[in-house]
Protein backbone atom coordinates (compact mmCIF):
# COMPACT_ATOMS: atom_id res chain seq x y z
CA UNK A 1 0.00 0.00 0.00
CA UNK A 2 1.03 3.62 -0.30
CA UNK A 3 3.15 5.23 2.36
CA UNK A 4 2.04 7.91 4.78
CA UNK A 5 -0.44 10.21 3.05
CA UNK A 6 0.28 13.85 3.80
CA UNK A 7 -1.96 16.72 2.62
CA UNK A 8 0.61 17.38 -0.11
CA UNK A 9 0.36 13.79 -1.36
CA UNK A 10 -3.43 13.93 -1.26
CA UNK A 11 -3.35 17.04 -3.44
CA UNK A 12 -1.02 15.32 -5.91
CA UNK A 13 -3.20 12.22 -6.11
CA UNK A 14 -6.24 14.46 -6.44
CA UNK A 15 -4.57 16.49 -9.18
CA UNK A 16 -3.87 13.32 -11.14
CA UNK A 17 -7.45 12.18 -10.68
CA UNK A 18 -8.88 15.55 -11.70
CA UNK A 19 -6.90 15.66 -14.94
CA UNK A 20 -7.54 12.02 -15.82
CA UNK A 21 -11.30 12.23 -15.29
CA UNK A 22 -11.84 15.68 -16.80
CA UNK A 23 -9.80 14.97 -19.94
CA UNK A 24 -11.27 11.53 -20.63
CA UNK A 25 -14.89 12.46 -19.92
CA UNK A 26 -14.55 15.57 -22.09
CA UNK A 27 -13.14 13.54 -24.99
CA UNK A 28 -16.09 11.14 -24.99
CA UNK A 29 -18.80 13.82 -24.71
CA UNK A 30 -20.09 13.08 -28.26
CA UNK A 31 -20.53 9.41 -27.34
CA UNK A 32 -22.17 10.38 -24.06
CA UNK A 33 -24.56 12.72 -25.87
CA UNK A 34 -25.72 9.92 -28.17
CA UNK A 35 -25.95 7.43 -25.28
CA UNK A 36 -28.08 9.84 -23.26
CA UNK A 37 -30.38 10.47 -26.23
CA UNK A 38 -30.77 6.72 -26.84
CA UNK A 39 -31.86 6.36 -23.22
CA UNK A 40 -34.13 9.40 -22.99
CA UNK A 41 -35.75 9.16 -26.45
CA UNK A 42 -35.38 5.56 -27.72
CA UNK A 43 -38.26 5.91 -30.18
CA UNK A 44 -36.43 8.58 -32.14
CA UNK A 45 -32.93 7.12 -32.28
CA UNK A 46 -32.40 3.56 -33.54
CA UNK A 47 -28.72 3.16 -32.75
CA UNK A 48 -25.40 4.87 -32.18
CA UNK A 49 -24.70 5.78 -35.82
CA UNK A 50 -28.28 6.94 -36.33
CA UNK A 51 -27.95 9.03 -33.19
CA UNK A 52 -24.80 10.72 -34.46
CA UNK A 53 -26.26 11.48 -37.88
CA UNK A 54 -29.58 12.74 -36.46
CA UNK A 55 -27.92 15.09 -33.97
CA UNK A 56 -25.62 16.53 -36.66
CA UNK A 57 -28.54 16.95 -39.06
CA UNK A 58 -30.80 18.68 -36.52
CA UNK A 59 -28.30 20.65 -34.41
CA UNK A 60 -25.07 20.69 -36.39
CA UNK A 61 -21.74 19.25 -35.19
CA UNK A 62 -21.88 21.43 -32.07
CA UNK A 63 -24.88 19.40 -30.92
CA UNK A 64 -22.50 16.56 -30.13
CA UNK A 65 -20.76 18.82 -27.59
CA UNK A 66 -23.87 19.61 -25.54
CA UNK A 67 -22.96 19.57 -21.84
CA UNK A 68 -19.19 19.82 -22.41
CA UNK A 69 -18.74 22.57 -19.79
CA UNK A 70 -20.53 20.79 -16.92
CA UNK A 71 -18.78 17.57 -17.89
CA UNK A 72 -15.27 19.07 -17.75
CA UNK A 73 -15.85 20.90 -14.47
CA UNK A 74 -17.94 18.23 -12.78
CA UNK A 75 -15.60 15.37 -13.52
CA UNK A 76 -12.49 17.36 -12.61
CA UNK A 77 -13.97 17.86 -9.15
CA UNK A 78 -15.24 14.31 -8.98
CA UNK A 79 -11.91 12.87 -10.12
CA UNK A 80 -9.98 14.96 -7.61
CA UNK A 81 -12.09 13.66 -4.74
CA UNK A 82 -12.46 10.07 -6.01
CA UNK A 83 -8.81 9.30 -6.71
CA UNK A 84 -7.51 11.37 -3.81
CA UNK A 85 -9.79 9.78 -1.24
CA UNK A 86 -9.35 6.31 -2.76
CA UNK A 87 -5.67 6.48 -1.87
CA UNK A 88 -6.54 7.84 1.59
CA UNK A 89 -9.13 5.19 2.40
CA UNK A 90 -7.07 2.38 0.86
CA UNK A 91 -4.32 3.12 3.35
CA UNK A 92 -6.73 3.83 6.22
CA UNK A 93 -8.54 0.52 5.81
CA UNK A 94 -5.28 -1.39 5.29
CA UNK A 95 -3.89 0.09 8.51
CA UNK A 96 -7.11 -0.86 10.33
CA UNK A 97 -6.85 -4.48 9.14
CA UNK A 98 -3.18 -4.62 10.07
CA UNK A 99 -0.90 -7.53 9.21
CA UNK A 100 -3.60 -9.31 7.18
CA UNK A 101 -4.14 -6.34 4.88
CA UNK A 102 -2.62 -8.16 1.90
CA UNK A 103 -4.93 -11.13 2.46
CA UNK A 104 -7.95 -8.82 2.48
CA UNK A 105 -6.77 -6.49 -0.26
CA UNK A 106 -9.82 -7.01 -2.51
CA UNK A 107 -12.35 -6.05 0.23
CA UNK A 108 -10.07 -3.10 1.04
CA UNK A 109 -10.11 -1.95 -2.60
CA UNK A 110 -13.89 -2.31 -2.71
CA UNK A 111 -14.49 -0.45 0.56
CA UNK A 112 -12.02 2.35 -0.25
CA UNK A 113 -13.46 2.96 -3.71
CA UNK A 114 -17.06 2.93 -2.44
CA UNK A 115 -16.33 5.45 0.31
CA UNK A 116 -14.41 7.76 -2.01
CA UNK A 117 -17.13 7.60 -4.65
CA UNK A 118 -19.90 8.66 -2.26
CA UNK A 119 -17.92 11.79 -1.38
CA UNK A 120 -17.13 12.51 -5.04
CA UNK A 121 -20.74 12.05 -6.20
CA UNK A 122 -22.10 14.68 -3.85
CA UNK A 123 -19.85 17.15 -5.69
CA UNK A 124 -20.65 15.75 -9.15
CA UNK A 125 -24.45 15.65 -8.92
CA UNK A 126 -25.32 19.29 -9.77
CA UNK A 127 -23.09 19.29 -12.85
CA UNK A 128 -24.51 15.97 -14.02
CA UNK A 129 -28.07 17.28 -13.64
CA UNK A 130 -27.21 20.27 -15.83
CA UNK A 131 -25.40 18.12 -18.41
CA UNK A 132 -28.29 15.69 -18.83
CA UNK A 133 -30.85 18.50 -19.05
CA UNK A 134 -28.82 20.27 -21.75
CA UNK A 135 -28.43 17.06 -23.78
CA UNK A 136 -32.00 15.78 -23.42
CA UNK A 137 -33.57 19.24 -23.88
CA UNK A 138 -31.30 21.36 -26.12
CA UNK A 139 -33.71 24.31 -25.93
CA UNK A 140 -33.81 24.29 -22.11
CA UNK A 141 -30.98 26.83 -21.80
CA UNK A 142 -28.34 28.53 -23.94
CA UNK A 143 -25.48 27.82 -21.54
CA UNK A 144 -24.60 25.75 -18.45
CA UNK A 145 -24.79 28.88 -16.29
CA UNK A 146 -28.31 29.64 -17.53
CA UNK A 147 -29.28 26.00 -16.98
CA UNK A 148 -28.03 26.15 -13.40
CA UNK A 149 -30.11 29.26 -12.81
CA UNK A 150 -33.28 27.83 -14.36
CA UNK A 151 -33.06 24.56 -12.42
CA UNK A 152 -32.51 26.46 -9.17
CA UNK A 153 -35.40 28.83 -9.88
CA UNK A 154 -37.82 26.08 -10.90
CA UNK A 155 -36.86 23.31 -8.47
CA UNK A 156 -34.60 24.80 -5.80
CA UNK A 157 -31.43 23.16 -4.49
CA UNK A 158 -33.09 19.75 -4.43
CA UNK A 159 -33.48 19.99 -8.20
CA UNK A 160 -29.74 19.44 -8.50
CA UNK A 161 -29.84 16.37 -6.28
CA UNK A 162 -32.91 14.45 -7.44
CA UNK A 163 -30.47 12.38 -9.47
CA UNK A 164 -28.24 11.60 -6.45
CA UNK A 165 -29.81 8.21 -5.56
CA UNK A 166 -29.40 6.83 -9.10
CA UNK A 167 -25.96 8.45 -9.38
CA UNK A 168 -24.93 6.58 -6.24
CA UNK A 169 -26.58 3.40 -7.51
CA UNK A 170 -24.63 3.79 -10.75
CA UNK A 171 -21.32 5.24 -9.65
CA UNK A 172 -20.65 3.28 -6.45
CA UNK A 173 -20.89 -0.20 -8.06
CA UNK A 174 -19.14 1.20 -11.15
CA UNK A 175 -16.23 2.56 -9.14
CA UNK A 176 -15.98 -0.52 -6.94
CA UNK A 177 -15.73 -2.71 -10.05
CA UNK A 178 -13.46 -0.20 -11.79
CA UNK A 179 -10.81 -0.04 -9.07
CA UNK A 180 -11.00 -3.65 -7.87
CA UNK A 181 -10.93 -5.17 -11.37
CA UNK A 182 -8.15 -2.79 -12.41
CA UNK A 183 -6.02 -3.58 -9.36
CA UNK A 184 -6.67 -7.33 -9.66
CA UNK A 185 -6.00 -7.44 -13.41
CA UNK A 186 -2.81 -5.39 -13.18
CA UNK A 187 -1.60 -7.44 -10.23
CA UNK A 188 -2.02 -10.69 -12.15
CA UNK A 189 -0.46 -9.29 -15.32
CA UNK A 190 2.61 -8.33 -13.30
CA UNK A 191 2.66 -11.79 -11.70
CA UNK A 192 2.52 -13.38 -15.15
CA UNK A 193 5.33 -11.17 -16.42
CA UNK A 194 7.43 -11.96 -13.35
CA UNK A 195 6.90 -15.69 -13.92
CA UNK A 196 8.18 -15.27 -17.48
CA UNK A 197 11.35 -13.58 -16.24
CA UNK A 198 10.22 -9.96 -16.47
CA UNK A 199 9.68 -8.67 -12.92
CA UNK A 200 7.91 -5.34 -12.53
CA UNK A 201 11.12 -3.65 -11.39
CA UNK A 202 12.72 -4.41 -14.76
CA UNK A 203 9.93 -2.87 -16.82
CA UNK A 204 10.16 0.61 -18.31
CA UNK A 205 7.64 3.31 -17.41
CA UNK A 206 6.10 2.90 -20.85
CA UNK A 207 5.62 -0.84 -20.34
CA UNK A 208 3.99 -0.21 -16.96
CA UNK A 209 1.63 2.28 -18.56
CA UNK A 210 0.72 -0.35 -21.16
CA UNK A 211 -0.33 -2.61 -18.29
CA UNK A 212 -2.41 0.24 -16.87
CA UNK A 213 -4.05 0.78 -20.26
CA UNK A 214 -4.95 -2.88 -20.78
CA UNK A 215 -6.14 -3.35 -17.21
CA UNK A 216 -8.24 -0.22 -17.55
CA UNK A 217 -10.03 -1.57 -20.62
CA UNK A 218 -11.00 -4.77 -18.77
CA UNK A 219 -12.06 -2.80 -15.70
CA UNK A 220 -14.11 -0.36 -17.76
CA UNK A 221 -16.12 -3.01 -19.59
CA UNK A 222 -16.94 -4.87 -16.37
CA UNK A 223 -17.84 -1.63 -14.61
CA UNK A 224 -20.08 -0.52 -17.50
CA UNK A 225 -22.13 -3.72 -17.38
CA UNK A 226 -22.49 -3.58 -13.59
CA UNK A 227 -23.70 0.02 -13.57
CA UNK A 228 -25.78 0.16 -16.77
CA UNK A 229 -29.30 -0.10 -15.25
CA UNK A 230 -28.67 2.79 -12.87
CA UNK A 231 -27.14 4.85 -15.69
CA UNK A 232 -30.36 4.50 -17.67
CA UNK A 233 -32.45 5.45 -14.62
CA UNK A 234 -30.24 8.51 -14.07
CA UNK A 235 -30.78 9.69 -17.64
CA UNK A 236 -34.54 9.28 -17.26
CA UNK A 237 -35.00 10.74 -13.77
CA UNK A 238 -33.68 14.16 -14.71
CA UNK A 239 -36.67 14.41 -17.08
CA UNK A 240 -39.10 12.87 -14.58
CA UNK A 241 -41.42 14.71 -12.20
CA UNK A 242 -40.52 13.71 -8.67
CA UNK A 243 -43.48 15.14 -6.76
CA UNK A 244 -44.10 11.72 -5.21
CA UNK A 245 -40.46 11.34 -4.20
CA UNK A 246 -37.31 10.14 -5.92
CA UNK A 247 -37.77 6.50 -4.84
CA UNK A 248 -41.26 6.42 -6.36
CA UNK A 249 -39.95 8.00 -9.57
CA UNK A 250 -37.22 5.34 -9.81
CA UNK A 251 -39.84 2.62 -9.34
CA UNK A 252 -42.00 4.11 -12.09
CA UNK A 253 -39.05 4.23 -14.49
CA UNK A 254 -38.09 0.62 -13.76
CA UNK A 255 -41.64 -0.63 -14.31
CA UNK A 256 -42.01 1.37 -17.50
CA UNK A 257 -38.71 0.23 -19.05
CA UNK A 258 -38.47 -3.35 -17.87
CA UNK A 259 -35.20 -5.30 -17.67
CA UNK A 260 -34.42 -4.94 -21.37
CA UNK A 261 -35.10 -1.22 -21.32
CA UNK A 262 -32.67 -0.71 -18.45
CA UNK A 263 -29.86 -1.88 -20.72
CA UNK A 264 -30.59 0.59 -23.52
CA UNK A 265 -27.34 1.89 -25.00
CA UNK A 266 -25.16 -0.82 -23.38
CA UNK A 267 -22.87 -1.46 -26.40
CA UNK A 268 -22.27 2.28 -26.75
CA UNK A 269 -21.59 2.60 -23.04
CA UNK A 270 -19.23 -0.42 -22.94
CA UNK A 271 -17.18 1.13 -25.73
CA UNK A 272 -17.27 4.55 -24.10
CA UNK A 273 -16.56 3.42 -20.53
CA UNK A 274 -13.90 0.91 -21.58
CA UNK A 275 -12.06 3.63 -23.50
CA UNK A 276 -12.64 6.20 -20.77
CA UNK A 277 -11.47 3.97 -17.91
CA UNK A 278 -8.36 2.85 -19.77
CA UNK A 279 -7.53 6.48 -20.50
CA UNK A 280 -8.10 7.49 -16.89
CA UNK A 281 -5.69 4.95 -15.45
CA UNK A 282 -3.17 5.62 -18.21
CA UNK A 283 -3.19 9.36 -17.46
CA UNK A 284 -3.40 8.88 -13.68
CA UNK A 285 -0.49 6.44 -13.47
CA UNK A 286 1.47 8.57 -15.93
CA UNK A 287 1.05 11.63 -13.71
CA UNK A 288 2.02 9.56 -10.68
CA UNK A 289 5.19 8.50 -12.47
CA UNK A 290 6.03 12.11 -13.33
CA UNK A 291 5.42 13.21 -9.74
CA UNK A 292 7.37 10.27 -8.32
CA UNK A 293 4.38 8.91 -6.44
CA UNK A 294 3.94 5.33 -5.28
CA UNK A 295 2.16 3.26 -7.96
CA UNK A 296 -1.39 2.14 -7.30
CA UNK A 297 -0.28 -1.49 -7.30
CA UNK A 298 2.22 -2.99 -4.96
UniProtKB/Swiss-Prot annotation:
Belongs to the mitochondrial carrier (TC 2.A.29) family. Its main location: mitochondrion. Gene3D superfamilies: Mitochondrial carrier domain. Residues 1-13, 82-105, 180-208, 284-298 are mitochondrial intermembrane. It is a multi-pass membrane protein. One of its GO terms (cellular component) is mitochondrion. Mitochondrial solute carriers shuttle metabolites, nucleotides, and cofactors through the mitochondrial inner membrane. Transports phosphate groups from the cytosol to the mitochondrial matrix. Phosphate is cotransported with H(+). This is Mitochondrial substrate carrier family protein N. The lineage of its organism: Eukaryota, Amoebozoa, Evosea, Eumycetozoa, Dictyostelia. It is found in: Mitochondrion inner membrane. GO terms for molecular function: phosphate transmembrane transporter activity. Solcar repeats lie at residues 8-92, 104-188, 207-290. Coiled coil: none annotated. The keyword Transmembrane applies. The keyword Membrane applies. GO terms for biological process: mitochondrial phosphate ion transmembrane transport; phosphate ion transmembrane transport; phosphate ion transport. Keywords: Membrane, Mitochondrion, Mitochondrion inner membrane, Repeat, Transmembrane, Transmembrane helix, Transport.
Amino acid sequence: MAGDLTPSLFLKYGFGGALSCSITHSLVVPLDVVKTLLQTNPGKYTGMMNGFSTVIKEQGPSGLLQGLGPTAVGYALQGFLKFGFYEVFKKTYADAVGEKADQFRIPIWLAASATAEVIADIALCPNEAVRIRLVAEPTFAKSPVEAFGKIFKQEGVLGFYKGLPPILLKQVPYTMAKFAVFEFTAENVYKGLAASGKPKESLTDGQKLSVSLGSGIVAGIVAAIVSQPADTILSKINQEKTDGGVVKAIGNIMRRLGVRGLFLGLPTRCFMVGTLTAGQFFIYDGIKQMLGLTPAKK
